[in-house]
UniProtKB/Swiss-Prot annotation:
This is MICOS complex subunit Mic26. It comes from Mus musculus (Mouse). It is found in: Mitochondrion inner membrane; Mitochondrion; Endoplasmic reticulum membrane; Golgi apparatus membrane. Keywords: Endoplasmic reticulum, Glycoprotein, Golgi apparatus, Membrane, Mitochondrion, Mitochondrion inner membrane, Signal, Transmembrane, Transmembrane helix. Component of the mitochondrial contact site and cristae organizing system (MICOS) complex, composed of at least MICOS10/MIC10, CHCHD3/MIC19, CHCHD6/MIC25, APOOL/MIC27, IMMT/MIC60, APOO/MIC23/MIC26 and MICOS13/MIC13. This complex was also known under the names MINOS or MitOS complex. The MICOS complex associates with mitochondrial outer membrane proteins SAMM50, MTX1 and MTX2 (together described as components of the mitochondrial outer membrane sorting assembly machinery (SAM) complex) and DNAJC11, mitochondrial inner membrane protein TMEM11 and with HSPA9. The gene is Apoo.
């Protein structure tokens, strides 16, 4: 077995060796002219120039092309709506998953507090009998009152933010009313110079 391995390794190792070969043209041979690549038969160019001719469209292809052309504005509109609504839907789904996970691992005492806050909203709905405005105001007020008992820090933060927003809205409304008042109701001294009295 050793002899077989020795014989098979010998010729394989010789194939990896490199040898230099020195070759020179014979001095008495006549000088040959070289051929260009285009002159070789392998690279011959066909004599006739090929021309691409497009096949005429069939009636089905023409109808599909017209349908695609007419539907393009609608498809682009749908793609635009999809690109705008997909992040919002993903955000809403993630919000739902987060709330579900929170409710699955709720802190102790969360559900009794939630029941008291919901009951406060129901009591507000009972007190609001008769008036539609009371039905809109009383339940959120009672629920907010119940929530502020259990979550005072969050209630203070929400009250501050709400107060700032209400003040900002009131200031904007005052400015708008003041501008409208100045435009529509001028002082009595300016009545002579108004464009209507010429």
């Amino acid at each position: 077995m050793f002899k077989v391995i020795q014989r098979s390794v010998g010729p394989a190792s010789l194939s990896l060796l490199t040898f230099r070969v020195y070759a020179a043209p014979k001095k008495d041979s006549p000088h040959k002219s070289y051929m260009k690549i285009d002159e070789l038969s392998l690279y011959s160019v066909p004599e006739g120039q090929s021309k691409y001719v497009e096949e005429p469209r069939t009636q089905l292809e023409e109808n599909i092309s017209q349908l695609r052309h007419h539907c393009e504005p609608y498809t682009s509109f749908c793609q635009e709506i999809y690109s705008h609504t997909k992040p919002k839907v993903d955000h809403f789904v993630q919000w739902g998953v987060d709330n579900y996970n929170y409710l699955q691992n709720a802190p102790p005492g969360f559900f009794p507090r939630l029941g008291v806050i919901g009951f406060a909203g129901f009591v507000g709905l009972l007190f609001a009998r008769g008036s539609k405005i009371k039905k809109l105001v009383y339940p959120p007020f009672f629920m907010g009152l119940g929530a502020s008992v259990y979550y005072p820090q969050q209630a203070i933060t929400i009250a501050q933010i709400t107060g700032e927003k209400l003040y900002d809205w009131g200031l904007r409304g005052y400015i708008v009313i003041e501008d409208l008042w100045k435009q529509n109701f001028q002082k009595p001294g300016n009545v002579k110079n108004s464009p209507g009295n010429k």
